[in-house]
């Protein structure tokens, strides 16, 4: 279609701008959390996160701590957006077609495998710590694109597309990991109800219902029953996203930008990037440094996470991408060099949002969760600083 060449870049540019801006706000939220957690406000901060909110009766109970409302409720909206992005990119975007998906797909696979292996090697003598193997396997797209935005035209657009596609596939892998490895004891009745609601979403899609309201109503019920089932509630957001139609609302208007999926994605981008993810960062990044020494970083769990993010990510992303390009399986992104590709691989070590999220699922005691935060913050910070520094000194894109 004649509109396709202009439509794709505009969608991509809007996405990159939104994610980069969200990355800046997330950075501020994380810094504020660390300041508050190490100030006289710390008791109030942690007490607020532990405050229970909701409703409880014999017939119906929905009462969680503020932290759980953020991690199970608000983050379900984040995962809804992630699911919408994955579906759109695979059906109508940068991940449509085998040739486009090979390089970011291979790099994403390496970028999940190598950090997990590094973590497992460091924690091989600690059976309890092995549960955190997936923590360094994630990449924070908002943080990484925020760093790239600071570099402007010094980084070619092709590498920004590569990083975006890689991070989306990385999110898909993280979703699969959460579903398979971090599911609690199952409530079969709630799971059956969730299955029925999922079937209802499929029926709405097959009947070509293009109004969003029915999907969102069923999706809200789906979230409740998934929460009660023992499967992590955020996966309800992904399931809902896969049911939202990509069909055009008006057949006379070309392009998927007129679809219910795009309308919902557009409506969610700014609230998620500028509110939900920063709130999550503020609630989960706060860790007190009181009494901490060098041993707090060199303990197996934080060391495994930090090395997994910094060392494992660059080895996996760059190593697998280099191998794919050298063997002819994939092509180098346009106007990019191997040095720039390595710089982007360093930025993939910024794990933050998804790493903190998986850390909260992997462990349930406060001391271990604090250890995961130290590892995530250290690995992400070193990756961000060195990745930015390298891309800054390299010659700009052609």
Curated annotation (Swiss-Prot):
Family: Belongs to the NhaA Na(+)/H(+) (TC 2.A.33) antiporter family.
One Gene Ontology MF term: sodium:proton antiporter activity
Keywords associated with the record: Antiport, Cell inner membrane, Cell membrane, Ion transport, Membrane, Sodium, Sodium transport, Transmembrane, Transmembrane helix, Transport
Classification via Pfam families: Na_H_antiport_1
Protein source organism: Bordetella parapertussis (strain 12822 / ATCC BAA-587 / NCTC 13253)
Name of the protein in its database record: Na(+)/H(+) antiporter NhaA
Matching InterPro entries: Na/H_antiporter_dom_sf, NhaA
Protein's cellular compartments: Cell inner membrane
Reaction(s) this enzyme catalyzes, per UniProt: Na(+)(in) + 2 H(+)(out) = Na(+)(out) + 2 H(+)(in)
Gene Ontology CC terms, in alphabetical order: plasma membrane
GO biological process: regulation of pH
């Amino acid at each position: 279609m004649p509109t396709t060449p202009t439509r794709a870049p505009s969608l991509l540019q809007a996405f990159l701008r939104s994610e980069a801006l969200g990355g800046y706000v997330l950075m501020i939220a994380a810094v504020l959390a660390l300041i508050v957690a190490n100030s006289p406000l710390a008791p109030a901060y942690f007490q607020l996160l532990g405050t229970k909110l909701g409703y409880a009766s014999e017939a119906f109970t929905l009462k969680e701590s503020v932290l759980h409302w953020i991690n199970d409720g608000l983050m379900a909206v984040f995962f809804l957006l992630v699911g919408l992005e994955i579906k759109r990119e695979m059906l109508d975007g940068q991940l449509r077609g085998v040739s486009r998906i090979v390089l970011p797909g291979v790099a994403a696979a390496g970028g999940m495998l190598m950090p997990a292996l590094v973590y497992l090697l460091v924690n091989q003598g600690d059976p309890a710590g092995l549960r955190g193997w997936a923590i360094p396997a994630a990449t924070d797209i908002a943080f990484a694109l925020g760093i790239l935005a600071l570099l402007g035209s010094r980084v070619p657009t092709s590498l920004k597309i590569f990083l975006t596609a890689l991070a989306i596939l990385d999110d898909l892998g993280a979703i699969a990991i959460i579903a398979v490895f971090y599911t609690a004891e199952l409530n079969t009745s709630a799971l059956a109800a969730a299955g029925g609601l999922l079937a209802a979403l499929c029926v709405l899609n097959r009947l070509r219902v293009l109004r969003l309201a029915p999907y969102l109503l069923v999706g809200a019920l789906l979230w409740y029953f998934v929460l009660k089932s023992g499967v992590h509630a955020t996966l309800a957001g992904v399931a809902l996203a896969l049911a939202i139609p990509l069909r055009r609302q008006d057949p006379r208007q070309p392009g998927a930008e007129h679809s219910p999926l795009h309308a919902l994605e557009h409506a969610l981008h700014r609230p998620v990037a500028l509110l939900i993810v920063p709130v999550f960062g503020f609630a989960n990044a706060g860790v007190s440094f009181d009494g901490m020494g060098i041993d707090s970083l060199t303990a197996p769990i934080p060391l495994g996470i930090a090395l997994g993010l910094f060392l494992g990510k660059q080895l996996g992303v760059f190593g697998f991408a280099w191998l794919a390009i050298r063997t002819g399986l994939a092509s180098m992104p346009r106007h990019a060099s191997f040095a720039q590709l390595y710089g982007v691989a360093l930025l993939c070590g910024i794990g933050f949002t998804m790493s903190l999220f998986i850390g909260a699922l992997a462990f349930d005691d406060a001391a271990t969760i604090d250890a995961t935060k130290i590892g995530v913050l250290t690995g992400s910070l070193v990756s961000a600083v060195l990745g930015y520094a390298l891309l800054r000194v390299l010659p700009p894109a052609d």
